[in-house]
Amino acid sequence: MVKQDPRDKSSYSPNLSIPINNQEEPTLNNNNNNNNNNNNNNNNNNNNNNNNNNNNNNNKNNNNNNIKHKDEENDFEDSIYQIAKEHEGEEDDEYFPIPLDELMPNHENDELTKKIKQTRPEDKTGLYVYCRNATYTVKHRENKKVKIKLLDDVSFFLRPKQMTLILGTPGCGKSTIFQMLAGQLKDKHFEGELLFNGHPINHKNHHRDISYVTQDDIHVPTLTVKETFRFALDCLGKKELTREEKQVSVDNCMKLLGLKHAENTLVGDNFIRGISGGQKKRVTIGVGVIKGSNLLLMDEPTSGLDSSTSFEILSDVKKFVTYGYSPALITLLQPSVQLTSLFDNLMIMSKGKICYFGPMNRALGYFKKLGFACPSHNNPAEFFQEVVDAPERYSFIHPPKCKTSDDFVKAYRESDIYLELMEKMDANKDGIVDDNKPKVLVDSTAKELGMYPHGIGYQTKICLKRGFIMISRNYYNFATRVFKGIFFGLLLGTLYWRIGHNQSGGMERFGLLFFIMTTIIFSSFAAVNSFFGERKVFYSQKALHYYKTGAYFISSIICDIPAGLIEVAFFGPIVYWLANLRPVFIRFVYFMILLFITDNLSLSFAKMCAAISPTIEIANVTASVILSIWLLFSGFTAPKNDIGGWWIWLYYISPYTWIFQGLSINEFTYQAYGCKDSELIPPRTPQNLLPYPEGFGGNQVCQYTSGEQIMDAFGINNPDYFKWIVYAILGAYIVFFYSVCFFALKYLNFEDKKSKLAVKKLKKKKKVIVCKEDEEPNCKVTTEALERVSDDNDDNADISNYDDDTVIDMKSPLTSPNYNNNNNLSGSGNNIKRRKVKTPSTLSPMVNSPLTNLSPMVNTPSKNGNHSKQKPISTSQKDISSETGSYLQFKKLCYAVDVKADDPDNPKKKKSQRLQLLTDIDGYVKPGQMLALMGPSGAGKSTLLDVLAQRKTGGHITGEILINGKPPSEFTNRIRAYVEQMDVLPPTQTVREAIAFSARCRLPPEVTKEEREIFVDKIVEVLSLSSIKDLKIGVLGNGLSVSQRKRVNIGVELASNPEILFLDEPTSGLDSGDAFKVIDVVNKIAKVMNRTVICTVHQPSAAIFEFFDQLLLLKKGGETIYFGPLGNQSSVILDYCDKLGMHIKPHINPADFVMTLADEGKMVEGPNGEQEHLDAKKAYFESNICKKEYEIMEGQLIPDDFVVKTYDSRFASSWMTQFRALCMRSWLSRLRRPAIFVSNCLRSILLAVLLGTLFVRMDYEQKDARSRVSLLFFSFLFAGMVAIGNIPTTVLERGVFYREVTAGFYHSTAYMISYVLTSYPFILSTGILYIIPTFWIAGLDSGRHSSKFWYCLFIFIITYIMYDAFALCLAVCLPNEVMASTICGIGLSLATLFGGFVIARPNYPSAYYWCHYLDWLRYPLEASCTNEFTGLTFVCTNNKGAVPIPIIENGVQIAIKYYCPITNGDDFMLTYGFHKFMRYIDIAAIFGYIFIFVGLSFWGFKKVRWLNR
C-alpha cells in the first residue's frame, strides 16, 4: 500500500466547520460527509454517461466555489475578527500542555529542587523584561541603500519563574531578540522601549545579570569537562565564592547535566578525541548557566540531543527557573510535546514580527479560532512552527483565512490576547508586569558594578593556569619542536662541522647564520594556523565577557615562551658548538638570547597576521609574502651593497636585517681569518706566475684577513657594540607586532562579519533585489535567476496519471486544481490517512514514467473553466527513470569493532577486545517502501545504515545481505546511492551542474545527451531547486542553506537513477518546515518513482513519521525491539504498544512515543492495572507482528515476474566520458576560484617587479656574478612557496573525491589525470608572469636568438610543475592540511640547504653528497645557472671588485696589480660544482621527480583514505 502525503486534508475527520458566509450553517455531522464521499465514490464507478454528469456537476460546484472564494477574499479585512468573536467561548485543549505534575512527578521535593532553594540568595527576584514597540534596522550587506528590519514593532514581557519558548523559521528574528536582550545590539539602530526591572539597559554590566547559552559548541579542546566548567566559573562567578564552593558548584552542574562520569575526559575537536557531540552540547549549556543569573537566554540548546536527554536537561532548567526565580527565553528547533509543555508562554515569529505571544495553554485555542486545527497525533510545537509558513496544511476553512505571515500578524494584533497584552503593558509602564510586584528589585544601572567580577590580575592568573594546562596536554607540539631542534641542530652542526677561520669558512659562516635564523623563523611561523583555532574560542568567550582582552593576551604571550625556549635550548647549543662558532661564553649567551628573541619576534608577527586576517588563507598568503620580502632584503641573498637606492628602505625596515646583523657581528668581530694555500689570490697558474707586469710574479695575498672585512663584503659595517642595540630594535618590533595584534583582537571580530547569506551568482552582477528565501533572509538573487523560474513552477508538483480510478496529488488537496470544496469543507485536520494507489505495474505507460509525472503539466482551460490534463512536455524521448527499485534483505546481521580497554590483570596496560555494535538484525525493504531506522543515541542506526550500504572500512561484519535475492557484488554501486549526513558537495559548481555531473558519470552510454538533460531538469523540478539551479553551492555558512544543500545532495545521488536510496539523518540541523520539505522529496522518490528507501531519522515529527511504511527500532547495544509496518496514522505500531500496556495520549508525537520502547527500565501497565517491567526485545519476538514479518522474509519476498538487472562493469560510463566530465568540472572549479588564481598572479607580478628591479639590468661586474645566482636561487624558492598555497584547496576537494569515488562516480585515475592536467595552464600562467618580467628587467643573458631565454622559461615551468606535484602528493597522502603544509615547509627548507647555493657542492662533507644529489632544487638551479653563465665574461671595470695584489721583488713592493677573481662564467660555475654537460641530464632529473611525485599522488588517490567508518 502506498501512503498518502501527510498534507492531504481530504480524509480529515471534521469536528468543526466555519461558515463561508452568514447564511450558511456550520456542518457538524461527520456521517453526512462520509455518506457524501461514499456516494461520490459510487458515482465514479458508474458508466461514462454518469461520469459526464458528475463532471458537469463538479464543474458547477467549482464555479460556485470560485465565486465564494472571490467573495471571501474581498471580505478578508473583517473575517478574522468575526471568526475570533464566533468562537470566543471555545475551551482550550484539555490535553495540551501536559500538566507539570505529570511531566515531572514530585518535582517540588526532589534533591535538585532542594539544592536550588538552599543556594538561592534570599534577596533574589530575577529580571522583569519589558519590551514595547521594538524595531531594529540594519543596512543590506550588498545594497547599502536598502534597509532591513530585523525586528519590526515587537512587544512582549518576561517575568521570573516563567519560561518562554520562541518558535519560527530561520531568519525570523529569533537570534536578534536574543542579541537585543543580551545587550549586543547597537543603540543607534534600535527604536522602542526596553526595560530590565524598570530601568534601561546598562551595557557596561548588563551581561552580569544574564546567562546566554549560544547554539555553537566552541570550547578549548585540550581541557577536560571539569576544567572547562571550572574556568567558566572562575571567570564569571562572584568574587566572594570560595574554592570549596566553586568545587561544589562544578560537581552539581556536571551531575545535573549527566557529565560527572566524563569529568576527566577531554572536550576534544576534529583532531583530538574527546566527548561526544551530545555531551559537548551539555558542556555548552553548563558553562552558560554555572555562574547563576537573573535572566536565562538559550539559543537552540538541544540541537543534536535525543528527546530523552533534551527533556532531562530542560526539565532541570525548568526547576532552576521556577525555584531559582529567573525568567528564561529559549528557542528550539524541533521540540517534542513534552518539551513544549514545560514552557509557560509561547512566542511565534516570522520576518521580524510577532505572530503570537501569549500563554502556552491558550495557543491551540487561539489558532482554532482563526480556522487552524492541530491534528490529534501531531505535536503542537510543530503545528505552531508550520502553521504560519504552510497554513493550507492545517486550515479547516478553504481557502485559509490567513495566507501569509502578515495576515497572521494582523490577526494577532486584532485578537483579545494582544489587547490583553497591551492593557497589561499600559498598566505597568514601570516595566514590572506582575500582579505581585516585589518590593526590592535588582538594578544593575544603579549599582557601581564593574564590567567584570574580577580584576585583570586575577583574570590573567586564571588564563595563565588554563594556558599551562593546555601546554601540558599539547605534548605533540613540544615533541615536534624538540625533535626539530635536535634534528636541525645535528644536521647543521655536522654539515658545517668545525668550520675553519679561512676564506671558505668565512663565507660558509654567513650561510650557516642565515640558515639558523630561517630555521627559528619557520618554526614560529606555524603559529598562524594554531592561533586561528584559539581565536575562535577567544571571540566566543570575549563576547560572553569571560575576561578582558589584555588578560588573555598577556597570558597567551607568557604561555608561548616555554615552547620556543625549549626548541632554542636544544637547537642553539648543538649547532653552535658542533659548527665551531666563536668559543667565547658571552658570545654564546648573546647567540642564545638572540635566537630566543627571534622566536618571539616571528611568533608576534605570525599572531599579528592571524589577528588582522579574516581567513586563514589570507593570513598565510599575507605572512608568506611579507616574510619572503623581508628574508630577501635581510642582507644575505641580496647584500646591502647590491641593493639599489629605490629598495634600500626595505633593507632597513626588515626585522631580519637586524637579526642577521646581530648574529654576524657576534660571530665576526675581532676575529682573524686566514687562507689555505688553495685560497690565496691569484691562484698559482702559469699565467699568474709570469713576472710583472705580464703576471703577478708568484705574489699571492689572502683576500680577507679579519671578520670585519668579510662583514664589509656583505654591507655590514657596524661596530661590535651595535649588537646590543639590535636587542632594542628587535624589542621595538615585538612591541609593535603585539600591539597591532592586541588592538585587532580587542576591536575586530571576523566571526561576526562572516557573511552567512552570500549565495553568489556565477555570472557578472545583474540588478540585485532583496528577497527572503525559504531558508535564508536577505539573500542576493539576480532578477535573471528569478525570471528563469516559470510561473507554474511549484515546490510540490501535481502528479496524476490518466486512469480515472487513481490520482496521486502531491499537493495539498486544498490548493489542487482538482479540489472539491464540498467534500473537503469541513476537514479539521484531526486525522492523517493514507490513500490507496495502484502499483506501478498496473498503471498506464504514462504513469510508469515517474519523473515525467513529477514535471509540470500543461493545463488547458476547457469551455467550462476547468483545466483538463494534457500529456507532459517532452515525452518523445524514452524515460530513463522508469525502472523499479530493488528488494533488500538482511539476516542475522552483526557488526563489531576492536577497541582498547583496561586490562583487569594489569591496569597500566590496554587490552584489545571486541565491542559488539549490532546483534542479529533482520529485516527487508520492498520497492516503493520507506524504512525508518530509529533508536536512541548509541543504538547503532548509522552503523546499520553503513553496513547495509557497504560503507564500513573496518570492523567485523557477519550475517547476510541480499539484494534481489543475491549477495552484493562489485557492481552493486550501480543500483544504490547513499546520501551522507554531512553534505560534502563541490563548492564551485552550481546546483544544476552538480546534478548533471552525477548523471553524466553514472548513467549508461545508452542514454543520449538530450535524454540526460531532460532527466536532470526533472530532478531539479522535483527537488524544488529551479529557483536556485544556477547558484553556486558554496561551503556551509557561505553558500546554500542547510535545507538547500540537503536537497542538492539528494539530487546528486538521485541522478544515478538508483534502485536503492540510503539516507543518513537527512533532517539533522533543520527546523520542522525544512525537515518536512526534505522528507517530502524522499517520499516522492519512493512512492512515485517506486524506489527502495532506507533512512535513519532523529526525532521525526508526526507528519514526517507518517511518510514511512516500515520501522526498524533499535535499542542501545544494537538489538531489534521492533520491525514491522507503521500502519495508517501509525495505527499498527500504536496498537502493538497498546497491547504492551503503553497508551498514547492526544498531541503526543507517535515517533517520540514509540521511542520510549527503547528506554531502559521501561514500566508499563500490566493486565490488572499494575506497573510491570517491559522487556521490549522479548515482547517483540513473541508478538504476531514478528511472526508475520519473518514469514514474509522466509517466504517468497520477490515476485516471480520480477526482472533482476545484471551488470558487467563497475561504472555506468566509460573512462573517457568520466575524464571529460572531470576535466570540465576541474577547469571550471579553478576558474571560479578567482581569488586564488588572481592572488598567485599578483604575487608573481609583485615579486617579479621586486626582484627584477632589485637586480635591475645586471652588468658583468664581479658582484653581478653572485647576484645572478642569488636571483635564480630565490626564484626557485618562490616556486615552492606557491606550491604550499595549493595544499588547502586540494585537501578541501579531497573530501568530495572520497565521497564520489566511494559512490562509484568514476575511476580514481580519471580524477587524478584530469586534476593534474587542468592545473598546468594555471601553473604555466603563474610561471610566465614571474619569469618573463624578471628575466628582462634583471637583464639575464638571452643568448643567441633568445635561446637562453626559452631554455630558462622551460626550466621554470617544469620546476613549477614539479613543486605542484610535490604539494599534491603531500595533500593526498597526509591526513590533513596542517601536517601537509608542515612537511612541505620542512622539505623546502632541506631543499634550500642542500640545493648548492647556501653551501657549494665542493664544500659539502663527503657524508652529505648523497643529500645534495637527492635534492630536487639542485637540478633546476644547476640547469638555469649553467644556461645563464655559459659563454659569459665578467670584468672589473676601474678595478671595481678586483683584489689588489702587492708586487714584491727582493723584499720591496714595487707596484700594486689588481686581480679580477671572476672572468669566465663556466669557471665560476665550477666553484658551485655545476657543469655545463649536466644541463640536459638536469631536465631528465626534474621529469623524474615529477614522475615520482605524480606516481605517489596516484597511489594516494587509489589507496589512501583518511576517512574511516
Curated annotation (Swiss-Prot):
SMART domains: AAA (SM00382)
ABC transporter domain mapped to chain residues: 129-376, 888-1141
Protein topology in the membrane: Multi-pass membrane protein
ABC transmembrane type-2 domain location: 472-748, 1231-1504
GO biological process: aggregation involved in sorocarp development; culmination involved in sorocarp development; sorocarp morphogenesis
Family according to the record: Belongs to the ABC transporter superfamily. ABCG family. PDR (TC 3.A.1.205) subfamily.
Biased composition (Basic and acidic residues): 1-10
Source organism (scientific name): Dictyostelium discoideum (Social amoeba)
Compositionally biased residues, Low complexity: 29-66, 813-831
Gene3D superfamilies: P-loop containing nucleotide triphosphate hydrolases
Molecular functions (GO terms): ABC-type transporter activity; ATP binding; ATP hydrolysis activity; ATPase-coupled transmembrane transporter activity
Positions of ATP 1 binding: G168, T169, P170, G171, C172, G173, K174, S175
Amino acids binding ATP 2: G935, P936, S937, G938, A939, G940, K941, S942
Top-level taxonomic group: Eukaryota
One Gene Ontology CC term in the entry: membrane
Database matches in Pfam families: ABC2_membrane, ABC2_membrane_7, ABC_tran, PDR_assoc
Region entry Disordered, spans: 1-70, 813-881
Ranges of compositional bias, category Polar residues: 11-28, 839-881
Subcellular location: Membrane
Membrane-spanning intervals of the chain: 477-497, 512-532, 557-577, 583-603, 616-636, 643-663, 725-745, 1236-1256, 1271-1291, 1320-1340, 1352-1372, 1379-1399, 1481-1501
Predominant place of localization: membrane
Descriptive protein name: ABC transporter G family member 5
Keyword terms: ATP-binding, Membrane, Nucleotide-binding, Repeat, Transmembrane, Transmembrane helix, Transport
